[in-house]
Amino acid sequence: MARRATLLHRVRDGLPSDATLVQVAGPYEFLEPGDVQAPAGTAGPMAAALARLAPDVLCLAPEEAAMLSRSGLDLPQSAVVLSGAPQTRVVPRGGVRLGFVFFPMTGKPGAEPESKARAAVVTAAREMRGKADLVIGVSPWGSMAEEAFLTANPDAFDVLLGAGHGFGTPAMPQPVPRTLWARSHTKGKTIGRLDISLPVKKPDAPWLVGENHRAELLNPDYTVPGDPDIAILGDAPTVAAAPPPATTATP
């Protein structure tokens, strides 16, 4: 987490003065899907580091929330712990209303979501359209289920931040042109950065690389020095958000 903090500082320090940074920390940032506890001696430092990093949007799988609570972390009231039904939040930043739809958990990691769960997500996304300028999904379903969902519902979301089993990729307008689909690797292998130009595109307009967005995966590898304020907390493995934590909007 110390290396991740360094990368986030670099992103923040490199932004134009009129840009807004929104950090999103998603499910499976601390545990692999299916795990219930962190390696011995790491949960406490991870909880302390998370408290210092203080992401704008914090979304946790239920087992992660339980693990962090056992480690003494009081989750902020704004934290979202995924459940059996979609949850929503509107987060205003820099004059833009960010509408988040947090997908429900499946029966077990990697399992195909039930049709009822898929329909509930679509309904939540449609209801969010009238409340937000940008509708963002946060999913723990894994890459296969997410791709199938986007293909079947190409207009549901402007951005989908995916997590769980599967590959990592910077935000790309695939498999549908009007949704940016981003996936970071679990447990710290990458951090996703997404820069969105303002004004935000209309829902029926496609995403065009270099025109209305830019995206990349940042790698907190051994070449990145750890932030000393985080490193001093103890033996916490470097973890990166899945979905991406660094989202910027620039005019």
Spans of model-derived segments:
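Acidic, metal/ion-coordinating pockets
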Residues: 1-251
